[in-house]
């Protein structure tokens, strides 16, 4: 520990090098190094723990306060702190590299196992191909061969998915019989997780790597639908098992999981009999329930296994509960294989294999229950993402949004999602009842006169439901959409709330949170609605879901000659906005909140859910080049690049579900119902208009769209940025071999430094950023325009910009000193230097300001 107690730092004069415990240290030139005593090091370390980068005044104060440092010059102390920070940075970097190395080693092992499995699958397919050729030459011969893991008879390939069909009858109503079922389930699950019992096809875009989610595959030509995932997480197997067993915490479609019986086994495992209910994703289908045997056991190699299957007449076993209005679905052998990794962490294999009884739903909705990609997104990938999220939060690297712990924010997300699912399904046992319709069947109205039963005892509902009596009313509808990508539609609805929302209805919902709500509003064709400000709270690791607060500013509405002018707030959850995520459900759910935003605040979620219906095609859908960079303003009508193959975007279908909830007082229930019914019809009409406007832009550019004045296309802006930088500084910003606008856009988008553009206004807001800029701000192009330049700069940065601003406007550019700024999530970001320059349009008029932050990194 001599190195920890005795520090050598660069100095300017000779100092005494003698110190206790330093006898074993190498001799050094006294003209270059200063030897500190352990007492001096202890004093410096104490200050370093409080302030790693003390100012000059603080260092001088330190010398005055600590007499033992009086023989050391302030400059030498400055160097000591510099070296100490360097050692700390090196230690963190070494630790990070060790972690990455462990991840790569484990991932390499996983890939080798996957390669072995694929080689077995290829060998089997080669064998079966030869057999099929033989059958074609000898059609009269029918042979059964079971030498491989499949059975081929008369040219038909039947996988052994249901050995229970040939299992002899046995008594499974006792622990021994249940253990036999459990052991068979374990063997079948392992053959799917690590063997070739199912033909797995890797999902497009899911590539492995040290920071990737893992290997994701879906089933091909098997009974039911199945999905498989392999990944690495930095949690121990027992913690992973605990998280996975808590299915409602990560499976958003799970309504409840009731463990009815727990039976210990002789090998140290447990058998559980579980009744589970899941929500229906839309109002057009019934919810599902499951009667499941779950078996938890350890393997000889130290792995932990959780496997499960449904108990049916063919498997035997006790009968489960029967609940009206639910369709009984089946879990085929599925589960989780959790293997410990050297150095900590776990390697997880997940298999989800279900038969959702697709024939019980209308034909147009069957892809919802027949698509393995939808299953993968909802269950398999969701489980892996949730575990990685918990691991990331446990590491302490997760920034807190609004001063709240990540677990609290995650609870808000779960409550929003669950509340929306409750509204869509309207279960009678939660207190929901249908109201009589007005003759049309397009909008369903349900009411709940026992809202406390619905929102739960942990929520303070006294503000929401007055003492004079009241409840919750829900208006909901579902519709089919053609040629509208779900992610694109939800992004538009999120960014352009004024296109579909009525400010009077928003005000009514917000007033319900206050002591004296006013009368039910009438719908207006127009009305003053102020700007919408998006305040980020939290997002998941891969930004597939984000929680935010929406502030609706500047409302001015008249109700009974009372003028209201007050900001309103919504808690909003947005997910599934990545157009490249096959089978992903896009959702926008929001609920009014008050300024206090308490942890137990009551939430009445409303919103939209769009689910793709065409899950059978395996071909990747055509996407725009540089999709995020293809338009400067979301919904601004950016030109879409024509695709040579539009067949994948034509004839795509999705189902849209809309549900809006309102509180009511008993004497106003009919009035609120009439308002809600009309409002949902108005929203449906608005969404249909939006869908018609969006759909043509995805059909190979067959219909030209024009950008609003002042909103150039992305490649035009890239050309302006590069040309203006070269004009002002004489240097090339974008080094490309080609002079085409596409290459300029690509070069700017992939530039390693953060490049951003902001408006030339009194309060500049960002209008565009390249990928590095979005990463630095921890945002997306959708939310970028809600971030102002002033918010990300610290005091020193703002002072430097104000000082150099006249120079920027006169000379066209200026260099700003390095410093620290703040991302949208509140994380500090350091940069070595910043460059600001004036971006000129083709007619040499100022269009915007561009900033480049050089060599930025999170602190």
Swiss-Prot record:
Residues 171-393 form the START domain. Its main location: nucleus. SMART domains: HOX (SM00389), START (SM00234). Probable transcription factor. Residues 100-129 form a coiled coil. The keyword Transcription applies. Keywords: Coiled coil, DNA-binding, Homeobox, Nucleus, Transcription, Transcription regulation. Residues 29-92 bind DNA. SUPFAM superfamilies: Bet v1-like, Homeodomain-like. This is Homeobox-leucine zipper protein HOX32. Belongs to the HD-ZIP homeobox family. Class III subfamily. It comes from Oryza sativa subsp. japonica (Rice). Residues 146-164 have a biased composition (Polar residues). It is found in: Nucleus. The gene is HOX32. GO terms for cellular component: nucleus. It holds the Pfam family MEKHLA. Expressed in seedlings, roots, stems, leaf sheaths and blades and panicles.
